[in-house]
């Protein structure tokens, strides 16, 4: 599965630095979530976000998870549907990033995001 990127990884030099390649698909639009600039960019319910499809290779998810600090709870990786198939994207925990964002529902942040994606028409269009 490829990834929808909306922050620093849209830059080919940054992607190449992290992954050793910068294989991009088309520019894309994520509907149902909008970008919020905080300590690092994140996504919030509603709106839309411009980004790119980053083509992933075998070990790329491990590198991306480390870059986004998934193990420390800074970001969560979630799957979103797309017109060319499902994609991964990363959503930053607003509490950890100092972002004024409210997600509906209760429970762990990952579950809040997953429930929102499932219950709303969140999707990537290229």
Positions of predicted regions on the chain:
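Glycine-aromatic micro-motifs
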Residues: 1-126
